[in-house]
Amino acid sequence: GKMKEGVTATDLVLTIVHMLREKGVVGKFVEFYGDGLKNLSLADRATIANMAPEYGATCGFFAVDEETIKYLKLTSRDSDLINTVEKYNRIQGLWADDTCNYNDTVHLQLENVQASLAGPKRPQDRINLEKVNLNFKEFSKNKPVEKEIKNHNYKMQDGNVVIAAITSCTNTSNPDVLVAAGLVAKKACDLGLQAVSYTHLTLPTNREV
């Protein structure tokens, strides 16, 4: 299938983390395959594979295919290197093969993935975006906190956003996710919204992928 408009690779990987934590894949190699791969960019695949520690697997793997070669060309890799990558992976049996057999399979329909958040403590604690408000109230109802900050004219209470970060090697390597964050920020500015003084804003850069 294909993800709905507005749903990102981050939503997809949080769904996968939730599913695979329930399944139990500790110590296993997880390969992602199926018809839906043709609708996932290499950046989206990298987002999923890079979250292997979160879903507990030894590694998350996408077989090399034409999308991989397309990405190498897009990022101006040397043509000799690209040819070597394709030849090597075909010889080594790492090229995508629809005839492979697997010990176990978990099915996921991409069109069913919804916008979501995870937390507040564990990445597998996924909650649909539309239910975050109720979920937060339920989580914090028995934890009343209010603290006056010395030398400042505000009080802190449970639920205040004190850190707003677009971070991790997963998020900052995916251009679609960064563009989405930029569009949300622009819309907030257009509506006259801005972060309060005690919220720390950060956007660390990442290495070349």
Language model feature labels by segment:
Residues G1-L37, N50-M51:
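Catalytic alpha/beta core of large soluble enzyme barrels
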Residues E5-V7, P53-A57, N171-C189:
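Alpha-helical support elements that line or immediately flank enzyme active sites
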Residues V17, K131, K137-D158, K186-V196:
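Structural signature of cysteine-dependent C-C bond-forming condensing enzymes
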Residues L20-G27, Y55-G60, D78-D80, A185-S197:
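Secondary-structure transition/capping motifs at alpha-helix termini
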Residues E31-D35, V162-C169:
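Short glycine-rich or small-residue beta-strand-to-loop segments that form or flank ligand, phosphate
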Residues L40-I48, P53-F136:
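Terminal amphipathic helices with adjacent charged low-complexity linkers/tails
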Residues T199-T205:
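Conserved small/polar residues in nucleotide/adenosyl-binding loops
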